[in-house]
A protein has these predicted regions:
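Conserved alpha-helix/loop element of class I SAM-dependent methyltransferases that forms part
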Residues: 17-18, 23-46
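Single conserved hydrophobic/aromatic residue that forms the stacking wall/gate
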Residues: 1-15
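Conserved nucleotide-cofactor-binding alpha/beta core module
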Residues: 41-160
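Short hydrophobic/charged patches on amphipathic alpha-helices used for structural packing
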Residues: 3, 37, 102-103
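Short, conserved glycine- and acidic-residue-centered signature motifs
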Residues: 7, 26-29, 33, 55, ...
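Substrate-binding/catalytic lobe of Class I Rossmann-like enzymes that use SAM or dcSAM, i.e.
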Residues: 150-177
Length: 177
């Protein structure tokens, strides 16, 4: 798909810095987008929840890998902009909604994979509850911009949850309604 035509900063997509997308938000560094996507181990038959739609770029990547992507953005203007771009580029397996990511998307749960692209102070229990058995969630966590870590949450086939701290990161804070 021709995402680069819609996400015009093609040269900047190779740098190691986050990029501003308006409303005091950023798109993650390209290597973090790739790393988080790889850690999720998304398969084609799966249903994915993304918290923090932003520009829609990460949702588009997930949609190339998964059957269905549901993405929530708390800032209405970003959600609307992302939805326009995603529709224009032919992504019919992505559903965009404006809302509070802390609540997840209960009427579409459970999700095989959950990706969170903004940092809450703690892992939201509602998101863990919406993770399917044999599911994986990747989430940056930390109140202080300089003390955040990326966590990989795995729920086994019996519903037992294991949490692994994997990498120091810097993300915008996750916002509640």
């Amino acid at each position: 798909r021709d995402l680069h035509k819609e996400y015009r900063r093609q040269r900047q997509m190779c740098i190691r810095d986050s990029l501003p997308i308006g409303h005091n938000q950023t798109i993650s560094q390209p290597y973090i987008v790739a790393y988080m996507t790889e850690q999720l181990q998304v398969e084609k038959h799966q249903k994915v929840l993304e918290i923090g739609t932003g520009s829609g770029y990460q949702a588009a990547i997930l949609a190339e890998l998964a059957n269905n992507v549901f993405t929530i953005e708390i800032i209405p203007e970003l959600a609307e902009g992302a939805e326009k771009v995603l529709n224009k580029t032919g992504y019919d397996n992505i559903t965009v909604r404006t809302g509070d990511g802390y609540k997840g998307w209960p009427d579409q749960a459970p999700f095989d994979r959950i990706m969170v692209t903004a940092a809450p102070e703690e892992i939201p229990e509602k998101l863990v509850q919406q993770l399917a058995n044999d599911g994986r969630m990747i989430i940056p966590v930390g109140a202080n911009l300089f003390m955040q870590y990326l966590w990989l949450i795995k729920k086994d086939k019996d519903g037992i949850v294991k949490k692994e701290k994997i990498l120091p990161v810097r993300f915008v804070p996750m916002v509640k309604e």
